[in-house]
Amino acid sequence: MNTNVAFGKKGEDMASAFLKKCGYQILRRNYRSGNNEIDLITKKDNIVAFVEVKTRHNLNYGHPAEAVTLSKQKELIKAAQNFINDNPSQGVDYRFDVVAIILDESKRNAFNEPCEDIFFIEDAFRTLP
């Protein structure tokens, strides 16, 4: 497996575990719609969240959340619309979240685990009316 792909999967695994601890149910991972993909689709109470996960080793190229550009948002919106059409639900609200992770594997904590920072941005962006 490509090292970037493996690193991204590790970030998605961390985000999934983090969201579960926060009370979210993971409905789908890596939902594909055409060329677009949603990393995680979660649910808590009556909210279904489409979650984009961005993981970086450090801040040399900016904060991971900055990588969720307008064009990426449009791709996520298209995929989410297809998911909603294929999985209609009554009484459910939808939103887009971002989990940004900085995972510095060169630094270790007291348990000899890589140092990590997880940033959870609820309702990170909205669709246009």
Curated annotation (Swiss-Prot):
Q: What is the protein name given in its UniProt record?
A: UPF0102 protein Ctha_1382
Family named by the database record: Belongs to the UPF0102 family.
What is the source species?
Chloroherpeton thalassium (strain ATCC 35110 / GB-78)
Pfam families (alphabetical):
UPF0102 (PF02021)
Q: Name one GO molecular function term.
A: nucleic acid binding
Record's superkingdom? Answer: Bacteria
